[in-house]
């Protein structure tokens, strides 16, 4: 998703979103389940959220929807959920990849068109969004948002007019789009899930009694008491209708799979399982690899909450250095990495974390974190540890240095904002004030996920598909 503030595409940070869908064949209202599912996916986006529902036994194509800026529990009060009655529905949490943070850009998107209604929620990024949008506008399309998700929704609606089924319209649309996408789509009588052929974005299937569920992560299934069935396969379109059966078909493409490694390093929740791999165990393995690669004499291994904790435990187990908690986290402050502006990121670090002085005073600390993007956050944490009496701080990072932008929806900014693109490891170590610094060797990255084929383009520029020839921010400034 890539719009700009002065026309349709924004030069801001890319996002990660969460999608959720449920179809209760017994006719029960699903909005409370969507609420809890989105709450479990809140870590994937904190700027806006939305829910769209319909009643499969009511007037065909009548969709009730509500969306707003803020967290799920801020936007949806009990009275609002009661208004959203229906037995089929989808939901979305957003951190903007494209478009400004306005309620117009919140999802799900709901379209009313010749064949009825369509609601869509999207996680991911299209690399040919600007090209497709221009083509559509030249044929009379009028867009109401600045997000590339509307391009997908409009494409499906346009193709549906000439297709026998919505699935056929989706198949025609995905032939035109390039990039990363996990979609949940609600037509008047169907719930549909779509995953891009590379498998870049996660999507899984669950079941609770007589209800089918789709979600970005398995933790959202657990939150509503649903059983995990399986992941949606890369390139698969799954449909649930009134028969209660799962219908599956695949896009007629054969590409090399490229699952986003950043899900396992940072984005996914610790209790999720994605493509048969436990996120927790992947991070434990990452920490163990760091301990083997960068041993150091130290008294305590600590992780940066939350995504650095499991890797720190893995480092501790492999090295034999005790694991401890160096920070208290204020749970009511959001994630610093997905704050919209640098100023907000910097100010929220100190509000979010405070050092446990009695734990670190007089000790040599190994501090494990998932990544260094700009270096500001880790520098602040090292300063806080030293002020609390830590004698040494050795930093270990469970990802390689970020060198290239991501075009597929992960919050990796342009090259000029990536500290590793213009500084050596030693220069970064000096700049952040660490006694030593070790990144995950890129050749060891695969160990986290076994034989799962991964995309690691933000580290080595080997993109799984053709991407813009120059950095997207440069394109937008021209």
Language model segments and positions:
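PRPP-dependent phosphoribosyltransferase catalytic core
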Residues: 174, 189, 225-231, 383-478
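Extended, hydrophobic alpha-helical segments in both membrane/secreted and soluble proteins
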Residues: 301, 308-315, 319, 323, ...
């Amino acid at each position: 998703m890539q719009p700009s503030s002065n026309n349709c595409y924004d030069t801001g940070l890319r996002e990660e979103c969460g999608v959720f869908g449920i179809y209760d064949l017994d006719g029960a209202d699903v909005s409370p389940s969507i609420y809890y599912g989105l709450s479990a996916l809140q870590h994937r986006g904190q700027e806006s959220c939305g829910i769209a529902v319909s009643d499969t036994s009511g007037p065909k194509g009548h969709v009730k929807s509500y969306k707003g800026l803020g967290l799920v529990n801020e936007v949806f009060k009990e009275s609002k959920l009661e208004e959203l009655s229906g037995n089929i529905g989808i939901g979305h949490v957003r951190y903007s990849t494209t478009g400004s943070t306005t309620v117009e850009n919140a999802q799900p998107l709901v379209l009313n068109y010749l064949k009825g209604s369509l609601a869509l929620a999207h996680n991911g990024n299209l690399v040919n969004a600007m090209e497709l949008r221009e083509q559509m506008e030249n044929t009379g399309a009028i867009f109401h948002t600045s997000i590339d998700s509307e391009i997908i929704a409009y494409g499906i609606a346009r193709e549906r007019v000439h297709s026998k089924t919505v699935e056929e319209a989706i198949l025609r649309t995905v032939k035109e789009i390039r990039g990363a996408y996990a979609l949940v789509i609600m037509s008047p009588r169907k719930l549909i899930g779509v995953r891009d052929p590379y498998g870049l974005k996660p999507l899984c299937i669950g079941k609770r009694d007589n209800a089918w569920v789709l979600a970005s992560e398995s933790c959202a299934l657990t939150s509503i008491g649903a059983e995990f069935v399986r992941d949606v396969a890369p390139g698969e379109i799954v449909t649930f209708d009134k028969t209660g059966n799962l219908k599956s078909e695949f896009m007629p493409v054969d590409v090399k799979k490229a699952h986003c490694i950043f899900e396992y390093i940072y984005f996914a929740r610790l209790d999720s399982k994605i493509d048969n791999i436990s996120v927790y165990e992947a991070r434990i393995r990452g920490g163990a690899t760091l301990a083997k690669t960068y041993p150091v004499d130290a008294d305590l291994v600590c992780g940066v909450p939350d995504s650095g904790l499991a890797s720190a435990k893995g480092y501790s187990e492999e090295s034999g250095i005790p694991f401890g908690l160096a920070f208290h986290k204020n749970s009511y402050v959001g994630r610093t990495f997905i704050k919209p502006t640098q100023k907000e990121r910097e100010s929220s670090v100190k509000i979010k974390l405070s050092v446990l002085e009695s734990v670190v005073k007089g000790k040599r600390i190994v501090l494990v974190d998932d990544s260094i993007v700009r270096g500001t956050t880790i520098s602040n944490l090292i300063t806080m540890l030293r002020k609390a009496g830590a004698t040494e701080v050795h930093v270990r990072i469970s990802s390689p240095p970020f060198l290239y932008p991501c075009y597929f929806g992960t919050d990796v900014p342009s090259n000029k904002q990536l500290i590793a693109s213009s500084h050596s490891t030693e220069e970064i170590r000096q700049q952040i004030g660490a006694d030593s610094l070790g990144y995950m060797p890129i050749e060891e990255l695969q160990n986290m996920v076994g034989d799962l084929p991964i995309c690691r383009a933000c580290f080595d520029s080997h993109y799984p598909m053709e991407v813009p020839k120059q950095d997207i921010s440069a394109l937008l400034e021209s």
